[in-house]
Amino acid sequence: MENKKESSLLYILTGATSGLLADSIMHPVDTVRARVQIEKVGKSQYKGTFNALNQIIKNEGVSYLYKGFPIVATATVPAHALYFLGYEYSKQWVTDRYGKKWGESTITHFSAGFVADALGSLIWVPMDIIKQRLQVQTNTQKLNPNQTYYKGSFHAGKIILQEEGIRGLYRGFMPALATYGPFVGIYFSVYEKCKSTISSLLSKEKDQYLPIPYQLGSGFFAGAFAAAVTCPLDVIKTRIQVQRSTEKQIYKGMWDSFKTILKEEGPKAFVKGMGARIWWIAPGNALTIASYEQLKYLFKDLI
């Protein structure tokens, strides 16, 4: 029982710390991703990821890249704690019941990743709603000058609750789970495979310590692959989440959004922002997982 408590504390501390570190560094790239993805094909003011970054800095200032960050900093600590706790315990649950072979299988890594995301999403989805509303505010205000202007993260949360209720904060929960559940499942499946392959090449046991460059490389590759594969789902999710319930609903769900986007904008719309998504997710995941593994290795003898 004591070991379980110690393990839980280890996963919570290392998960929370690693998540905050990565989000602090990668938030500006996420702002660019959100701005690019909400633009319709043929009506874009940005010519690509780096053009969007330059225009935002030029027209709105560097500080705009950190729009929505206060809510991210507040939410990422408990969200990442739940996320890594869910992943580690899901793997352990399978190992305890079906043996180490099943515990280290790809299907277990995928399933544990999905469970981890489902737990983290209880906090991440409201955070995402607030963050993305702030990130795209300049664009949406041009379309509807009469809508409420959010003065910051906590003001946005208050207004959303007042105007849309708790459902407003969980708008797009299922699309978010349908996007990030598979993403995290694919991510951990690829990451664990990379880790075991590298360990084998270095003649190490899978659970042995790997040097930081290998952890970063595995995390980056897994993140880039998973981000590219799930980009169409992310476009749909983002379009749904930035809608306000007080406005006309263009997108009424995942399937309706898919049909509407395909009909009005064509297949190209589903890869909008892929570059920004990869450059937000891949380095962010590399930083998160490498710092998580490092902190877990350092703290395990202290807790």
Swiss-Prot record:
Solcar repeat copies, ranges: 6-93, 104-197, 210-298
GO molecular function: iron ion transmembrane transporter activity
This protein's record includes keyword Repressor: no
Name the UniProt record assigns to this protein: Mitochondrial substrate carrier family protein E
Alphabetized Gene3D superfamilies for the sequence: Mitochondrial carrier domain (1.50.40.10)
InterPro entries referenced in this protein's UniProt entry, alphabetically: Mit_carrier (IPR002067), Mitochondrial_sb/sol_carrier (IPR018108), Mt_carrier_dom_sf (IPR023395)
Family the entry assigns: Belongs to the mitochondrial carrier (TC 2.A.29) family.
Membrane topology: Multi-pass membrane protein
PANTHER family registered for this protein in UniProt: MITOCHONDRIAL SUBSTRATE CARRIER FAMILY PROTEIN E (PTHR45758:SF3), MITOFERRIN-1-RELATED (PTHR45758)
Topological domains, Mitochondrial matrix: 30-67, 131-171, 237-268
Keyword Chloroplast attributed: no
Keywords, ordered alphabetically: Membrane, Mitochondrion, Mitochondrion inner membrane, Repeat, Transmembrane, Transmembrane helix, Transport
Pfam families with a match to the protein in the record: Mito_carr
Organism whose genome encodes this protein: Dictyostelium discoideum (Social amoeba)
Function: Mitochondrial solute carriers shuttle metabolites, nucleotides, and cofactors through the mitochondrial inner membrane.
Subcellular location: Mitochondrion inner membrane
Residue ranges, Mitochondrial intermembrane side: 1-8, 89-109, 193-215, 290-303
Transmembrane residue ranges: 9-29, 68-88, 110-130, 172-192, 216-236, 269-289
Main location, first listed in the record: mitochondrion
GO CC aspect terms: mitochondrial inner membrane
